[in-house]
Design a protein with these regions (language model features):
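Bacterial N-terminal signal peptides that target proteins for export
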Residues: 2-14
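Basic/polar N-terminal segments that are highly enriched at the extreme N-terminus
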Residues: 2-5, 24-31
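Bacterial N-terminal signal peptides
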Residues: 11-23
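Extracytoplasmic c-type cytochrome modules immediately beyond a signal peptide or single-pass transmembrane anchor
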Residues: 27-149, 165-198
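The canonical Cys-X-X-Cys-His
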Residues: 150-160
């Protein structure tokens, strides 16, 4: 049988197109919304801790407060834009009034505080909450992960602050209520709200 070059390549091209049209079996399965939330929480916490660590090394607690004021909202906004979720931080005793909790966040964090005050091992993962509710509007999905006070956090959130830090906090956050904490206590939470789906 004498086939032209284009006729011989047609079955090969057809086979390639067929392979491209198939779903990617054996690849990474798509993450669920709660798995994506956990990954985002890891990223938010990791990036913010890295920024705060650099600020503490370069300029101490006053520089760290400045980083929290400027960089934390920028990181959250970038993650919100890339994920489609509303990414942020909240606390019952907040430093920035823009981070004040809504009713659900407050209730979840009160539960976190009770959980953290029980005799859990120090190495346990921070408590988290996965909330999915259905209404006439559709399905609402929320994720919260506790931010637990660590010894390094005491410089900015402990009972005793350096005078220059106290001055900076009063200047930048006149309504601050985020001091007087001890290690192991609930400091706040990372919070994600995904778009309502039908």
């Amino acid at each position: 049988m004498n086939m032209t070059r284009s006729a011989r390549s047609a079955p090969i091209l057809f086979g390639l197109y067929a392979l491209l049209a198939l779903p990617a079996y054996g690849g990474e399965p798509e993450m669920t919304w709660d798995e994506r939330s956990r990954a985002l929480a890891d990223q938010l916490v990791s990036e913010l801790q890295a920024e705060l660590g650099r600020a503490m090394q370069q300029g101490g607690p006053v520089a760290a407060v400045a980083v929290c004021k400027s960089r934390a909202p920028e990181i959250a906004a970038r993650l919100s834009a890339s994920s489609g979720a509303d990414v942020g931080r909240t606390a019952i005793r907040w430093r920035n009034p823009a981070n004040a909790p809504d009713d659900l966040e407050r209730a979840v964090m009160q539960g976190f505080a009770v959980e953290l005050s029980s005799a859990l091992p120090a190495a346990a993962a921070p408590p988290e909450a996965i909330v999915e509710s259905r209404s006439a509007r559709g399905t609402e999905r929320r994720y919260l992960r506790a931010i637990v006070m660590q010894p390094v956090c005491l410089a900015c959130h402990g009972a005793t602050l350096a005078p220059e830090l106290a001055t900076a906090i009063v200047r930048d956050y006149p309504q601050d209520s985020a001091t007087g904490f001890e290690p192991g206590q609930l400091r706040g939470a990372v919070t994600f709200q995904w778009p309502v789906t039908r």
